[in-house]
From Swiss-Prot:
SUPFAM superfamilies: Cytochrome b5-like heme/steroid binding domain, DEK C-terminal domain, Nucleotide-diphospho-sugar transferases, P-loop containing nucleoside triphosphate hydrolases. This is Chitin synthase csmA. Glycans are attached at residues 58, 642, 840, 1044, 1195, 1428, 1462, 1568. PROSITE patterns: CYTOCHROME_B5_2, DEK_C, MYOSIN_MOTOR. One of its GO terms (molecular function) is cytoskeletal motor activity. Induction: Expression is increased under low osmotic conditions. An abaA response element (ARE) and two CCAAT sequences, to which the HAP complex binds, are found in the promoter region of csmA. Moreover, consensus sequences that are recognized by Rlmp and Msn2/Msn4, transcription factors known to be involved in the response to osmotic stress, are also present in the promoter. Residues 1794-1849 form the DEK-C domain. ATP binds at residues 102-109. It comes from Emericella nidulans (strain FGSC A4 / ATCC 38163 / CBS 112.46 / NRRL 194 / M139) (Aspergillus nidulans). The N-terminal myosin motor-like domain (MMD) does not seem to have motor activity but is indispensable for polarized cell wall synthesis via binding to actin that ensures the proper localization to the hyphal tips and septation sites near actin structures.
Length: 1852
């Protein structure tokens, strides 16, 4: 073609083929200028002959040329390319491949869609539509908006169109295949600024209806904490996984996109329910992004825990703050809310062949959630694409040829999502494709041209082979090294070093930078500059190696896999069961999935790669199976399922390939397909005209850079020299040329003649030795392919199938249109061109009517499916199985009857729906809790009644004042002013304020204070008494002569001058008959204080003095003056006074008072023969005229009883306080105990404590002043867990402290644990050795609970109680000689044979928490107490706080800790009955000193304490809240004759809860466990001993106080209110009681000089409302707050109680057991058969023994163990030497290879008898002894020295 268009005849821009340009225009600059000239006239394309298309993205329209049609447009050129490829496919039977190259934003995806549309338009099958939909679905799931383009592809695409070549004219499209490579998963959780995540997520948010949004939870207000800490509200719809809210509106019609996506799935025959499930998973992914994590305290006790660690403190855990969002995710994933939340809080890793659970902080939980979202999206994409392929892919055997469209994401200079791995793999793919491009143009025909003896001028070009080999070479390329280092568990620094060693001075394309460092536990101290550099064809790129290996592993933790196994969603189960998810099973337990990985390799291979046999010209495999796993598949069958299974199994055996390795394999396959001999490649170079996406702007510098990068000028130059695309043998060539016999000569000569006739240029046609080389143009001309008719189905046929045509285009085309979409394109929504959107009807996509389609698209796709609530309830249900049947005890039945009696009125549905308690056992527990609370409140009410109500009931309150008491209210010395009128006591002081001082001054009134003022108020008799006949003459007067009852001046005289002011009687001028009555009513209403009171005894005294006084109904009446004639008549002047009767009282009444004076005449009064009216009238007269007061019963018998009853209770309480006081003072002076020789075990349970706490605890135990040889330090690590803030698992921290090197790795052995179902089977590792610290050398034993292989989360973790049981059960079996589990046998072996002590020797066990530090003399003092009293079974010491001033919460605990020990425990200790021996610091007696009978580890204790079925409220409170108290209860119950004591001299220091939440949780546990242990203590024998004052009784009284603690605060408040309201009657008894409580306490700490306790006591008193009111009430109500687990009891047939569990049924036979004697015999057999086996197998410690200086134990100097390690002995079964074969025979601590003291003493005497005493030295004697005994006696030096001195001094 060169020279066919002479320059100057036409404009240069008309020339579309760059090689056709003159030679002087072949430079980068001139080619750029030529492209610019074409670009500016609307021709954005050019060609590289027939091989390649160059397209510039004009950012406007890809389908319009200069004249408005598609001629000259990118779309037109791609159609032409497709037509040429299709022609060659049909004419030559070659496979075709079109490879797209170019940067992101250059339009590759758009041109790819045009190309696919063109190919599909050549076929007339409905399959074409399906392939279009398939491509659309792929793009929807894998494309996104980037900074450079709105449709950036983020997955490599190998799209295969499959053809059948049976048609002689045109090949038939029979299928297709989408092979996706490496989706950019990191984008899901990390959306770069200014970009979007994958389009489908935005489609879902915008395209769902209101009903669908409600179901998916997309309509709820969204609150996300932004990076700045601000809350973003629903107004902005801030979705964390969708980037900035502005990305929701960027001109892409997401709503229509969702409808098209659903339609495409329906057209590909996805069921409606499956489409709904897909949408639910997408919604779940969005919601995962919304999860907000925070730190909390684990205040609920789990089903397998027993109160936690760190002295009952709360473990810091990560919690989800927005539980509503969490429930949506759980519903869609078919999981329980609780287990999903818990799964975010930890992650299990495999480190150094050990599974370790890392406790995650909120940031770690966020990363865990992001991992879940990435996994879900990756699996969803894999699932959808695989299902699409199943619907479009043809059978492999029927495929004759294929057209492959290869489009990988453009080269990336930087990793926008922060994923270095994605960037590296993407660039490696670009490098490989570019290298294939270069080889196709420069190298592919070179060999053949040479064989055919055709000379072609060489062309220089940039060769990227170094980079390709460095990156992609199998075995030692960069990706292979990365994969290998990842699988080996190397660090990033080691990887960079490996890269340096491999490429330094060997390959210039790759250089290694600096490296970081790490500790091997995933906690890397990173160096930000750890990196390597690759010189790519597009420029150098620096890749950070930080975190690269972990990212390459792409490990899905076993936690997530284990979680998903429990899903109730069939769709989620299918997602996690597909072939794209590769799993790693434990080598010893195939059902246990250790980890998994989403494959980075496509599930399918190209059809070319799957052929069993191929012609030599076709693709052949030459890679080894190890290098290419696909090779094995291609040879073993075509079934995808079978091949996948084989691929998985191969990986598991040889180690799973990581992302880089899988991607490398898939790239290798792509490369081999492309380089097969039967494939013709085309290339599409896509260029950006500028970097700013400005339409119709051409940036020459930008374009020239791309031309240089892609080597277009060199390719063009090469094509000017050799543009050969087809090689035809002479016969074929001549046949096509239709050369008959006209031309005479050889075939070669004939061919030369034809070429001469055709006048083709030399670079396009050459004759070789056996055939002819032609360009595609020349071949097409020769073969007359232009005469072939290629069908183009551009209109709908009669059948109604909407085959792709220009009007509707197709999905693959429209979806990714970068330029202006064609009119009415269904893809116009992406670019916001709403005027051109197609109407949303089914016929836009498919002519067939799809039943229910319109309802599906416009309505609710979730209609008739499960609601979210149903899914959530289903997810919370567990798959349970029956594991056991349990009988129900009689006491339980009786208790439940009481519970139902107390709670029958609360309906179960209310508990279920309002309380949200679905399970029946939890509902029953709530009823029990409520019933217990009712009983507790009843007890409190009874207590209140006894304190307040009972005295008032027996002795009602009387408002009476004796005359003497009235006299005291005289207004003097601050006293109140009271006076009385006719027995009525009034408040004179109050009255004075309202009196008229102008008439009578206040001073005059004050003299009436304290006296009887009756004489001041004369009465009008006729107004107050109707008399015996109903009428009394007003002239009748009654004289008032006060009786001086008390003998003092207590009344005023009748002649008082002030009485005239109140005298309104008849004879006065101012007659007011009712004045007195009115005034008395007024005074009583306003100033009433009570009545004058006289006792019954005093009334008798008065009667004896001729006083006519008696009482009726408690009121006292005095008729003395009346009977004595104190009546007279006085009228006004002139009145007639004759005939007036002054006896107005009935004679019967008068006689009664005379006869029964001084008595209670109520009965007689009622018996008087009076008419009812007369009786009423007489009573009125008595009440108004003769009443003098009330009977005073305050000193009566019943009132005395009430008073002394309360006093007795007070005395009892005071006596307890006094006893506590004396108990605290009973100890004598501080004595230093002697050295003791008892063997003790010091046990420390460890969970997630930090290294500092563990080291403090361990060191304090080791440094105790107790014989080191007789101490055994036992540390039990509860699970392989990395606590928050730690960099290693807790067991590793412990072992590092003790000096055990990492190379020591014993086999895990089985033992029984406390757990549900199969969790009863646990496994542990046993370590032992010597720990040296500050001159102490202490033997230690470490038990690490590692769990079974099937445990993927928190392996081995079973709780603190289980850690205690490990040692308790072991000692129990030792003492009873019972069969032991393998781990217990190993423990026995270590203690007996390595440490050298028979386990039965140990007599005491000291249990200390991991955050507790013990005093140096603690063990000595405790053992001393136990030796002084052999009946002691447990002894505790005083625990103080080390963090007293950390927070207000700790401050209020200091004094409480001090008093609870020095008063409460000291008092209980008096009676030998401490009810709670704290687990943080207690020593127990293992066995009886005399008989050796097991005590602490007796069968009864061990069986009761190891209770597994903890399914009732009572048992949970006993074993999950207060296991320490319950253990003490068991000791008291089963060993009632033994004592539990307190020794305040034994000191320990612990850490108290520092936050209110943890403090509340701790006290809730303590208080509730106290209540439930009280129930356990009630049936104990000897509860009431002599005089009800035995040890048990007083303790019982003490425990009762726990229940009524709230009453204490109420009583104190009552006293304060009493004191404020009435200072006259102070309850001295109560205040003396309070003073005694705190006064005696003060004496205690003053005597002990604890002066600081004064301040702490004040703080404690201020906190009394917290301790006595808030905590108990909170605790009682939260008695059922548990993590209930999944084991429960249900009612089966006929009322049977059946235990069901989701943990499976435990078979005790699964753990073999043997007695120690049997195990020893096997050890002997193993030793004697050592010659028949490998000496390495089965050895627990794989370390070599280096003899070193012997310690006194016969061990090498112990610390650090990395220098002097434990011996490795030839035992198959353990790490220890056998007793028979080892040189450490009988390694008892006292005589390990050393002579006894007696033998040494005997020899010393012998030496001294013959030695020269003037010259002999102790050193000489020691050396002589060593010579005689033949052993090193350094360990015996102190004894030798002291014995020598003793012999010489004559003491021995």
């Amino acid at each position: 073609m060169v020279g066919t268009l002479p320059a100057g005849h036409t404009p240069s821009h008309v020339q579309s083929s760059l090689p056709s340009l003159p030679a002087h225009l072949q430079s980068d600059t001139h080619l750029t200028a030529h492209l610019a000239s074409r670009f500016h006239v609307g021709l954005p394309t050019a060609r590289l002959s027939s091989h390649a298309l160059i397209s510039l993205n004009n950012y406007t329209s890809s389908s319009k040329g200069p004249d408005g049609g598609k001629e000259g447009s990118a779309m037109g050129e791609t159609e032409d390319l497709a037509r040429r490829a299709y022609t060659r496919l049909g004419a030559r039977g070659e496979n075709q491949a079109i490879v797209f190259l170019g940067e992101s934003g250059a339009g590759k995806t758009t041109l790819r869609s045009h190309l696919l549309s063109s190919f599909l338009s050549f076929s007339s099958t409905p399959l074409s539509s399906k392939l279009s939909y398939a491509a659309f679905i792929f793009d929807t799931l894998t494309t996104t908006k980037s900074l450079t383009t709105p449709t950036a592809s983020k997955a490599g695409l190998f799209l295969e169109l499959q053809y059948d070549a049976s048609s002689s004219v045109n090949p038939t499209l029979i299928g297709g295949k989408i092979i996706d490579h490496r989706l950019e998963r990191s984008r899901i959780a990390s959306v770069p600024t200014g970009e979007r995540s994958f389009h489908v997520l935005y489609y879902l948010l915008a395209g769902t209806s209101a009903a669908e949004k409600a179901h998916l939870g997309l309509d709820s207000p969204i609150h996300v904490t932004t990076a700045g800490g601000r809350l973003s509200s629903a107004d902005h719809k801030r979705w964390r996984y969708l980037g900035h809210p502005t990305q929701l509106k960027v001109g892409i019609n997401d709503a229509d996109g969702f409808q098209h996506f659903k339609t495409a799935l329906r057209k590909l025959e996805f069921p409606r329910s499956e489409i709904a499930e897909i949408c639910q998973i997408l919604a779940a992914i969005l919601h995962i992004g919304q999860l907000d994590f925070g730190s909390g305290q684990a205040t609920l006790t789990g089903a397998e825990e027993s109160g936690g660690y760190s002295h009952e403190g709360g473990e810091t855990v990560t919690v989800v703050k927005n539980k509503d969002v969490l429930s949506i995710i759980a519903a869609f994933l078919g999981l329980g809310v609780g287990e999903l939340e818990a799964s975010f809080g930890y992650r299990t890793k495999t480190i150094h062949r050990e599974r370790v659970t890392v406790m995650l902080d909120p940031k770690g939980a966020r990363r865990s959630a992001d991992e879940l979202s990435r996994v879900l999206y990756s699996l969803l994409v894999a699932y959808v694409i695989e299902n699409v392929n199943q619907r479009i892919c043809a059978a492999e055997d029927s495929v004759a040829n294929t057209v492959s469209i290869i489009d990988f994401p453009g080269f990336a200079q930087a990793c926008s999502t922060g994923s270095t791995l994605d960037q590296l793999l993407n660039n490696a793919a670009c490098e490989s494709l570019y290298n294939f491009c270069l080889r196709s143009f420069f190298d592919r025909k070179a060999d053949m041209l040479e064989r055919e003896e055709v000379a072609v001028p060489a062309t220089s070009y940039f060769d990227n082979t170094d980079a390709v080999r460095g990156l992609l070479k199998q075995g030692n390329g960069l990706l292979s090294i990365l994969d290998d280092q990842t699988r080996r568990g190397r660090t990033d620094a080691q990887f960079v070093e490996a890269v340096r060693r491999r490429f330094e001075n060997k390959n210039p394309a790759i250089t290694a930078g600096a490296s970081g460092s790490g500790n091997g536990y995933g906690m890397v101290s990173q160096n930000a500059r750890s990196s390597f550099t690759v010189k790519h064809f597009a420029g150098e790129v620096d890749y950070s190696a930080t975190g690269l290996l972990e990212e390459n592993g792409e490990v899905i933790s076993g936690d997530l896999m284990n979680l998903m196994k429990s899903t109730r969603s069939d769709f989620v189960r299918e997602l996690f069961g597909q072939e794209a998810l590769q799993t790693v099973a434990h080598p010893k337990e195939k059902t246990a999935i250790m980890q998994a990985q989403v494959s980075s390799k496509p599930l399918r291979m190209p059809s070319m790669a799957r052929r069993k046999t191929s012609p030599a010209s076709r693709l052949t495999f030459d890679a080894t199976p190890a290098e290419d796993p696909y090779e094995t598949e291609s040879q073993t069958g075509s079934s995808a399922k079978n091949s996948s299974a084989k691929r998985k199994s191969g990986m598991l055996m040889g180690g799973m390939q990581c992302a880089a390795g899988q991607f490398l394999s898939s790239l290798d396959i792509v490369n081999k397909c492309l380089t097969s001999g039967n494939l013709n490649p085309y290339f599409v170079f896509c260029l950006k005209p500028n970097d700013r996406r400005i339409a119709n702007q051409f940036d020459s510098k930008c374009v020239r850079t791309q031309i240089q990068t892609l080597g277009i000028a060199e390719i063009s130059q090469r094509l000017r020299n050799a543009d050969f695309s087809v090689f035809l043998p002479f016969a074929e060539f001549l046949g096509l040329a239709e050369v008959g016999n006209v031309v005479v000569g050889s075939d070669k000569e004939k061919s030369e003649v034809v070429l001469d006739e055709k006048r083709w240029p030399g670079n396009e046609a050459r004759v070789g030795s056996t055939g002819v080389f032609l360009s595609e143009r020349c071949w097409a001309d020769l073969a007359k392919v232009g005469e072939r008719v290629i069908p183009s189905f551009a209109a709908e046929d009669d059948g109604g199938d909407a085959l792709l045509h220009p009007r509707t285009a197709n999905y693959a085309d429209s979806k990714v249109r970068l330029l202006n979409p064609s009119d009415h394109s269904p893809g116009a929504y992406i670019y916001g061109d709403e005027s051109k959107q197609a109407s949303n009807t089914s016929r836009d996509f498919d002519g067939r009517s799809d039943a229910g389609y319109s309802a599906f698209n416009s309505g609710d796709m979730f209609h008739n499916l499960e609601t979210r609530e149903q899914m959530l309830e289903k997810g919370n249900e567990k798959q349970m199985e029956e594991v056991d049947e349990v009988p129900v005890s009689g006491s339980r039945k009786r208790w439940m009857a009481i519970v139902w009696l107390l709670t029958f009125y609360i309906p179960t549905p209310a508990i279920r729906y309002i309380g949200r308690m679905k399970r029946k056992d939890i509902q029953i527990a709530w009823r029990e809790k409520f019933a217990i609370n009712l009983l507790i409140w009843l007890a409190c009410a009874i207590a209140v009644f006894i304190i307040v109500g009972f005295p008032s009931l027996i002795c009602p309150t009387q408002h009476v004042y004796s005359p003497a008491e009235l006299s005291s209210h005289d207004g003097k010395d601050g006293h109140s002013s009271y006076t009385s009128i006719r027995g009525l006591v009034l408040d004179l002081g109050e009255f004075m304020d309202s009196h008229y001082p102008g008439i009578v001054p206040d001073s005059a009134l004050k003299k009436y204070a304290g006296v009887d003022s009756t004489a001041l108020f004369p009465v009008q008799v006729s107004a107050l008494c109707l008399g015996k006949d109903g009428n009394v003459d007003p002239k009748v007067l009654l004289d008032y002569k006060p009786t001086n009852f008390s003998g003092s001046v207590t009344s005023t005289s009748s002649g008082d001058p002030n009485s005239v002011y109140h005298d309104f009687r008849y004879f006065r001028d101012d007659y007011r008959p009712d004045w007195y009555a009115e005034q008395m009513i007024y005074l009583r209403a306003n100033y009433y204080k009570g009545w004058i009171g006289y006792s019954s005894e005093y009334l008798h005294t008065l009667a004896s003095k001729s006083q006519n006084v008696a009482s009726i109904n408690g009121k006292i009446y005095d008729l003395t003056s009346y009977i004595a004639g104190g009546r007279r008549i006085q009228g006004r002047e002139g009145d007639d006074t004759t005939g007036i009767d002054t006896d107005f009282m009935d004679s019967l009444v008068v006689d009664l008072f005379q006869q029964k004076a001084g008595e209670d005449i109520t009965k007689y009064w009622e018996d008087l023969p009076l008419t009812p009216k007369l009786r009423v009238d007489m009573m009125d007269c008595l009440n108004n005229l003769f009443i003098v007061g009330h009977v005073d019963t305050r000193n009566s018998t019943q009132c005395q009883f009430a008073r002394y009853f309360i006093l007795a209770i007070s005395v009892l309480i005071c006596s307890v306080i006094v006893f506590k006081f004396f108990a605290a003072l009973q100890f004598g002076k501080k004595n230093v105990p002697e050295n003791l020789d008892k063997f003790i075990i010091c046990q420390v349970p460890a969970y997630t404590e930090d290294e500092e706490s563990l080291r403090r605890a361990i060191d304090s135990m080791a440094r105790m002043q107790y014989d080191d040889k007789r101490k055994l330090l036992v540390v039990i690590c509860d699970g392989m867990i990395i606590g928050q803030g730690n960099d290693r698992p807790t067991p590793r921290i412990v072992l590092d402290i003790l000096g055990v090197p990492e190379s020591v790795d014993p086999e895990p052995l089985s033992f029984e644990s406390l757990g549900e179902g199969m969790k009863q089977h646990n496994m542990g590792k046993v370590y032992s050795g010597l720990y040296e610290v500050q001159g102490h050398i202490v033997p230690f034993l470490v038990v690490v609970k590692v769990g079974k292989p099937s445990e993927v989360s928190r392996p081995g973790n079973r709780g603190k109680r289980d850690s205690q049981m490990v040692l308790m059960r072991f000692l129990n079996r030792v003492h009873y000689n019972l069969p032991m589990s393998p781990m217990e046998l190993e423990m026995h072996h270590h203690i007996r044979n390595i440490i050298g002590v028979n386990p039965t020797f140990y007599e005491f066990i000291l249990q200390v928490d991991a955050d507790t530090v013990v005093a140096p003399d603690a063990a000595t003092r405790m053992v001393s107490s136990c030796l002084n009293d052999t009946r002691i079974i447990g002894v505790c010491g005083e625990t103080s706080l080390t963090n007293a001033k950390t927070s207000a919460v700790t401050m209020i605990q200091v004094y409480e800790y001090y008093i609870s020990h020095n008063l409460t425990k000291a008092f209980e200790s008096l009676f030998g009955s401490i009810t709670c021996l704290p687990g943080c610091f207690t020593m127990y007696r293992i066995r009886s000193a005399e008989s050796g009978k097991p005590l602490f580890v007796s069968k009864e204790i061990v069986e009761a304490y190891s209770e597994i079925r903890v399914d009732t409220l009572h048992m949970k409170n006993l074993l999950h809240l207060g296991e320490d108290r319950y253990l003490t209860t068991l000791l008291l119950k089963h060993h009632p004759k033994f004592k539990t004591k307190y020794n305040f001299r034994a000191q320990a220091y612990t850490i108290a809860p520092e936050s209110w939440t943890v403090f509340l949780s701790q006290r809730r546990r303590w208080i509730n466990s106290t209540v439930h242990n009280l129930v356990e203590l009630i049936p104990l024998q000897q509860l009431c001993g002599f005089c009800c004052f035995s040890m048990r009784f007083v303790v019982f009284i003490d425990l009762i106080s726990t229940i009524i603690m709230p009453v204490t605060v109420a009583y104190i408040v009552y006293l304060i209110v009493w004191l404020v309201r009435d200072t006259s009657t102070i309850p001295w008894t109560s205040f003396l009681l309070l003073a005694a409580i705190y006064g005696l306490q003060a004496i205690i700490f003053i005597v002990r000089r604890k002066w600081e306790m004064i301040g702490w006591m004040i703080i404690y008193i201020l906190a009394i409302p917290v301790y006595s009111l808030a905590l108990p009430l909170y605790s009682f109500w939260h008695m059922d707050d548990f993590s209930w687990g999944n084991t429960r009891i249900i009612t089966g047939e006929k009322g049977r109680k059946i235990v069901i569990s989701d943990e499976g049924k435990f078979d005790p036979a699964s753990i073999p057991k043997k007695r120690w004697e049997e195990y020893q015999a096997e050890l002997w057999e193993a030793q004697t058969s050592r010659d028949d086996r490998s000496e390495i197998s089965g050895i627990s410690y794989g370390t070599k023994y280096h003899p070193a200086t012997q310690s006194e134990y016969g061990f090498p100097g112990s610390r650090p163990m990395s220098q002097l390690e434990l011996p490795r002995h030839m035992s198959r079964m353990s790490l220890a030497p056998s007793e028979m074969m080892s040189r450490h025979m009988d390694m008892e601590l006292e005589d390990v290879n050393l002579p006894s003291d007696d033998a040494i003493l005997s020899e010393i005497r012998d030496i001294l008898r013959t030695a020269d005493l003037m010259t002999v030295t102790k050193k000489n004697i020691k050396q002589e002894l060593e010579r005689r005994f033949g052993v090193n006696l350094d360990a015996k030096r102190p004894y030798i020295n002291s014995a020598t001195e003793a012999v010489l001094s004559g003491n021995l």
